[in-house]
């Protein structure tokens, strides 16, 4: 495929992702929109390769820093939800399914702790700063609920990828003017 088609495709997906990130200013979309934008980059990853999907992720991240997006959502997008769907595809290419699951779980927990560190220490959004016990209980609760949400998110990504291959890939490839290699 010509590089102009790849660049144009990345530009379109980056623009769409950036516009969606602007929706994080609406409180109900605080965590859902960054997850959806990350899912959006599965198409460039599956059709063009991981480096092009990471390019879309990088462009959207930089534009999110420049434009007026909700900072907490942007931290979650840059630190976890934006790159995870791309990394998931790369991790699932490993031969050992157990190693892949352990690696994904470790990546998620490290990224989640890092995101919350940035949110609390850099952005200063710690509402339980003076209450040590409550903050500890809250942190453990967030990790537990976050891991449950991660499992659901990972399963949903897998099913979404399967649905893409079954129902939408042919149309996307036609729109991108790619030869059908199915």
Show the residue positions of the predicted features.
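Interfacial aromatic-anchored transmembrane helix boundaries in multi-pass membrane proteins
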Residues: 22-30, 61-90
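Hydrophobic transmembrane alpha-helices
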Residues: 1-55
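Transmembrane alpha-helical core residues of multi-pass small-molecule transporters
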Residues: 13, 56-64, 80-81, 103-108
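Alpha-helical transmembrane segments and their cytosolic interface
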Residues: 136-182
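Short helix-perturbing small/polar motifs within transmembrane alpha-helices
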Residues: 78-117
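Mid-bilayer segments of alpha-helical transmembrane spans in multi-pass integral membrane proteins
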Residues: 70, 105-122, 147, 151
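Membrane-interface helix termini and inter-helical loops of multi-pass transporters
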Residues: 122-137
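Hydrophobic alpha-helical transmembrane segments
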Residues: 7-12, 32, 54-58, 74-75, ...
